[in-house]
UniProtKB/Swiss-Prot annotation:
Stretches the record annotates as Disordered: 495-535
Compositionally biased region (Low complexity): 510-527
Gene: mss116
Subcellular location: Mitochondrion matrix
UniProt GO cellular component terms: mitochondrial matrix; mitochondrion
GO biological process: mitochondrial mRNA processing; regulation of translation; RNA splicing
The species this protein was found in: Schizosaccharomyces pombe (strain 972 / ATCC 24843) (Fission yeast)
UniProt remark on domains: The Q motif is unique to and characteristic of the DEAD box family of RNA helicases and controls ATP binding and hydrolysis.
Record-given protein name: ATP-dependent RNA helicase mss116, mitochondrial
Keyword Cell cycle listed: no
SUPFAM superfamilies: P-loop containing nucleoside triphosphate hydrolases
Length: 535
């Protein structure tokens, strides 16, 4: 593989420390040696689920499963569990949910929902749903989901007809459903579980979660919160949900460095008009050196994922997949499952897979252009080097994005160079770009501008070279023949929208794509208020 390293430009400094959480009970990460380590040894786990776990190939518990099943599962305690993704926490909280659903066998014949699990993204919710469906086969438990991008009416009908004892949902969609009093009446929640709580907070769902909690839980509801990190904004929500009476279980190994400190990381600097050729050269070299490569490629926008993935897959010899929030739920499920099962492949994606999604054996993560912030960078590279496996991370960085390196100078990052494409390969790539529709190229370019105002802004330092930046961007997408595009990009970069009366290529372009949006939380009726209104 012809990727040369020019020596470490950054080195690890110190250790990432979680902020202390005021008012929380002392961390306790000590494993009790007398705790069972096999599912078959857990006395409080029913034979039904022991058989289901055995059929699914689960025998030995991971540390987080061991802690939850021995310390939380037998009791009715509320708990906060700090654990990284990829440690088996999904199975741990599903078994708790199953137990709460099965408190009384006759309840399976009722039309009530007895357990609610909230997930930050559709992809993660579907992943939890698939795992739950496999484990509940033959148990009588009915599992359903409520997520955006799906038919709301179909979900409502499934809930009202009693097709769910366990509901897995995203906050926005569940808020929509809870505006319907009949849906609220279907809830008799014995357990309320938050997965990836820190990401739920990052996505602006704090108030929504508190509203949902007030609407669907009672004082008898068991509450579990799972989170990889514990920043103050997360602990504040936990207090609102759990109060002060809960168990805190820390499953982080204090001796294990975080993924972003131990995974080898490389930065490849490139000119704007050479981003695609540099990306293709890197991917070709990675896959040729390891035919079993499983790579996730992150891009900043939906349109960029569609365009870059669509062009580059013609030049790569292993299966390629595209995943983002613009696809239907059925498409996303199919793509996720296909990539998870393939022996080798490349997944082009937005940040919908940066956290929570568990794809096994990812050999490399590649970021094409810099992320929005340090947290995004860290979460992206966290997709590789999981479960004791090795991995690598590559960052293809624009010259104008060099200041970003200052924010990750504490990480083990090295500078690398790659062999340029041959003249013939470069000509073929350029031809494929030109064969793409002007609409897809122009829309990808515009969303790239929207995602990187710091690169394309018309600040005083850049005005002298600003035109060169826009020319490079147009050259990248082979769009020199779009009338007025240069003028529009210059106006956009200065925060002025489009020139008055400008019609450009006279194509109608959709507004800038975004992989997620934040909804304004709505006030939901609490269970008590709803019951009073019914009277």
């Amino acid at each position: 593989m012809n990727i040369s390293l020019k020596g470490a430009i950054f080195s690890t400094v110190g250790r990432f420390n979680l902020p202390k959480v005021q008012g929380f009970i002392r961390w306790n990460s000590t494993m009790k040696s007398q705790q069972p380590t096999l599912f078959s040894e857990v006395a409080s786990l029913s034979s039904t689920f022991k058989n289901s776990l055995s059929r699914a190939g689960f025998e030995k518990m991971t540390p987080v499963q061991q802690r939850v099943l021995n310390e939380v599962f037998p009791n009715e305690e509320n708990a906060v569990v700090q654990a990284k993704t990829g440690t088996g926490k999904t199975l741990a909280f599903l078994l708790v949910a199953f137990k709460d659903v099965l408190k009384g066998k006759p309840r399976l014949n009722s039309s009530k929902i007895h357990s609610v699990i909230l997930s930050p993204t559709r992809e993660l919710a579907l992943q939890i749903f698939e795992e739950a469906r496999k484990l509940t086969y033959g148990t009588g438990i009915r599992v359903s989901y409520a997520i955006g991008g799906n038919s709301k009416m179909r979900e409502e009908n499934a809930i009202r007809r009693g097709n769910a004892n366990l509901l897995i949902a995203t906050p926005g969609r569940l808020e929509d459903h809870l505006q319907n009093p009949r849906i609220l009446e279907s809830l008799s929640t014995d357990s309320f579980i938050l997965d990836e709580a820190d990401r739920l907070m990052d996505m602006g769902f704090a108030e929504s979660i508190l509203n949902i909690h007030e609407a669907v839980t009672t004082t008898k509801t068991r509450k579990l919160c799972f989170s990889a990190t514990m920043p103050p904004k997360v602990s504040n929500v936990f207090r609102g949900i759990l109060g002060t009476d809960f168990k805190l279980i820390n499953c982080l190994d204090p001796n294990e460095p975080p993924t972003h400190e131990r995974v080898p990381q490389f930065v490849i600097e490139t000119k704007l008009d050479k981003v695609f050729s540099s990306s293709l050269s890197l991917l070709q070299q990675l896959t040729s050196s390891n035919p079993s490569s499983r790579i996730i490629v992150f891009l900043p926008t939906i349109s960029m994922v569609d365009f870059v993935g669509g062009v580059l897959e013609n030049h790569l010899k292993i299966p390629c997949f595209i995943l983002h929030s613009g696809l239907t739920t059925a498409q996303r499920r199919s793509i996720t499952e296909s990539f998870r099962k393939c022996q080798s492949g490349i997944l082009f994606a937005t940040d919908v897979v940066a956290r929570g999604m568990d794809f096994p054996n990812i050999t490399q993560v590649v970021q094409i252009t810099g992320p929005s912030n340090t947290d995004d960078y860290i979460h992206r590279i966290g997709r590789t080097g999981r479960a004791g496996k090795t991995g690598e991370a590559y960052l293809i960085l624009l010259e104008q994005e060099k200041p970003f390196l200052n924010s990750i100078k504490h990480l083990p990052l090295k500078r690398a160079t790659i062999e340029p494409l041959s003249d013939q390969a470069l000509s073929t790539l350029r031809s494929d770009i030109e064969k793409s529709s002007k609409f897809s190229r122009t829309n990808a370019l515009k969303t790239l501008y929207g995602s990187k105002p710091h690169v394309f802004s018309g600040s005083s330092q850049r005005r002298a070279t600003g035109k060169n930046i826009h020319e490079s961007a147009i050259a990248l997408f082979s769009l020199h023949d779009v009338p007025g595009l240069m003028e529009e990009l210059i106006y956009k970069s200065r925060g002025r929208g489009s020139p008055k009366g400008f019609r450009g290529s006279q194509l109608k372009y959709p507004s800038s794509s975004s992989s997620s949006f934040q909804r304004r939380p709505r006030s939901l009726p609490s269970r008590g208020r709803y019951q009073q209104s019914r009277r």
